Amino acid sequence: MIDRYKHQQLRIGLVSPQQISAWATKKIPNGEIVGEVTKPYTFHYKTNKPEKDGLFCERIFGPIKSGICACGNYRVIGDEKEDPKFCEQCGVEFVDSRIRRYQMGYIKLTCPVTHVWYLKRLPSYIANLLDKPLKELEGLVYCDFSFARPITKKPTFLRLRGSFEYEIQSWKYSIPLFFTTQGFDIFRNREISTGAGAIREQLADLDLRIIIENSLVEWKQLGEEGPTGNEWEDRKIVRRKDFLVRRMELAKHFIRTNIEPEWMVLCLLPVLPPELRPIIQVEGGKLMSSDINELYRRVIYRNNTLTDLLTTSRSTPGELVMCQEKLVQEAVDTLLDNGIRGQPMRDGHNKVYKSFSDVIEGKEGRFRETLLGKRVDYSGRSVIVVGPSLSLHRCGLPREIAIELFQTFVIRGLIRQHLASNIGVAKSQIREKKPIVWEILQEVMQGHPVLLNRAPTLHRLGIQSFQPILVEGRTICLHPLVCKGFNADFDGDQMAVHVPLSLEAQAEARLLMFSHMNLLSPAIGDPISVPTQDMLIGLYVLTSGTRRGICANRYNPCNRKNYKNERIYETNYKYMKEPFFCNSYDAIGAYRQKRINLDSPLWLRWQLDQRVIASREVPIEVHYESFGNYHEIYAHYLIVRSVKKETFCIYIRTTAGHISFYREIEEAIQGFSQACSYDT
């Protein structure tokens, strides 16, 4: 059983048959060793008790009820005076029934079987290590052809031919008949090898260090040859080099983790604890069983049949034995991963069996549904909304969430400031929501970052740290620029908030995970904090302005006349004189006082270089004043000159929205320049 205080991680890998036996076997007090499941039965149909040596055997997996054996005797658990510690009649130990959640069993396979994950999953680890085509290995595993066993240094009958099925098709039917003839069993066992046993022998003969050396030499030779000029040959060389790299990495991994390649072929099949594959009785007396039980029963049936063929009858045809070995291999494949070889196996109701892979993988699998993604302490969850007034590194937490997340810190603050005598009084003050509680909460939040996470976390920017502030409502406020890293938008997305507790976690959150420190994509280096969606629409509205030209006031409906030279008035048109401003602060102030609109044209005095003005550009109008000064009016700017043609000032034609956008960019550039100067 995994101790949660000693084990911080879980790794799935290959184990040796000895390790499987150590997990599954146990020695009961009378000296008998139990653990092997030999019968495909579950419960007796009359007594409704587990069958002995079956898939739910109490001798192997422990009692169904704590302290009660299969006979019905009761003993107090943990009482040293109680003797004996097990029932001598049925062999069941008097232990806690929770042992059935982690006590394993095993099935001793009559013939070796390959683990389908390492044979059929891509890339195929077995094919990579043996450097053979997957199709050839599948034919060998499923007894479609045989392999000559190199048992001596001298050539033998079949060693001259090797894997003969692919070379001479006429041998396809004659050779099996030859070897299945009565009296040739010794010769057959000496000369040929087929099934997963042949794969196991080849894997056991591998030297991983020699594989690495030979692969490296071949990779260097292919790299020195250079391009051949033939596109097809060049592609084959590239694929071969990639294969050699994968093969070397795989061999290094086996050496580093002390895993033997032959462990990919199973001799002992582990049996899951009964509580992980239960049989439940529902209303009406009907039983509901896990599909794993039916798949285990199929394996045991076929394995026992193969055992009977090999032990009870010496004259069993070899073809029948090979066919039964193939059935055992297919049964184990279905148990581990149903449907990986094509059409999945179904029950009587045409429903696909859920194999071990289906139980553990996917969103509804054991890991993601039961072990991962669960609620933890000091965490919350809510819908995100936009917070346009927030800084990039801040987020808004609702009061209801914040007081729950930081409740222990607030209690400590109340006790330290002698505002509460104990924890109970502090909790009552928090429930009453006294003003001092919010003051202490704000002090706590100022020195404590929080982590925001949006599922699915596909890269490291899926979880970032922020400085929290209190907001009203029940939603989390987020700066819109950080949405791209989370792949989030404000259409109802939810995010989880976590509080880092340890000093190491807080230091990591402050130094590495703050949102304003993750402005570039870690994958390609492009900016990731860029305006999207609502911000782009807002910037468009801010800088769009009116489409009215500079001559709109002159050629407007107020100046329209009919054929009788009479003025035509329109009540919907409002004459707007374009105002002049000396600086941007006056223009923004006028907008805030609602004297001008956001998109209303205005003239702003500007320090513009004369060289940017095209000398060939002709003014649209020239207005003269009484003292001789005049205004040259162009499409987007206006120049005030003296009598001596000296330039007094220049006005540009813009809007309050453009001015506001320009000021934001200018402040950002100045802040960035100051930050760079501090770093240098």
Swiss-Prot record:
GO terms for cellular component: chloroplast; DNA-directed RNA polymerase complex; mitochondrion. Its EC number is 2.7.7.6. One of its GO terms (biological process) is DNA-templated transcription. Zn(2+) binds at C69, C71, C87, C90. The keyword Nucleotidyltransferase applies. Mg(2+) binds at D489, D491, D493. Binds 1 Mg(2+) ion per subunit. Binds 1 Zn(2+) ion per subunit. It holds the Pfam family RNA_pol_Rpb1_2. Its main location: plastid. It is found in: Plastid, Chloroplast. GO terms for molecular function: DNA binding; DNA-directed RNA polymerase activity; magnesium ion binding; zinc ion binding. Its cofactor is Mg(2+); Zn(2+). Keywords: Chloroplast, DNA-directed RNA polymerase, Magnesium, Metal-binding, Nucleotidyltransferase, Plastid, Transcription, Transferase, Zinc. It catalyses: RNA(n) + a ribonucleoside 5'-triphosphate = RNA(n+1) + diphosphate. Belongs to the RNA polymerase beta' chain family. RpoC1 subfamily. In plastids the minimal PEP RNA polymerase catalytic core is composed of four subunits: alpha, beta, beta', and beta''. When a (nuclear-encoded) sigma factor is associated with the core the holoenzyme is formed, which can initiate transcription. DNA-dependent RNA polymerase catalyzes the transcription of DNA into RNA using the four ribonucleoside triphosphates as substrates. This is DNA-directed RNA polymerase subunit beta'. The lineage of its organism: Eukaryota, Viridiplantae, Streptophyta, Embryophyta, Tracheophyta.
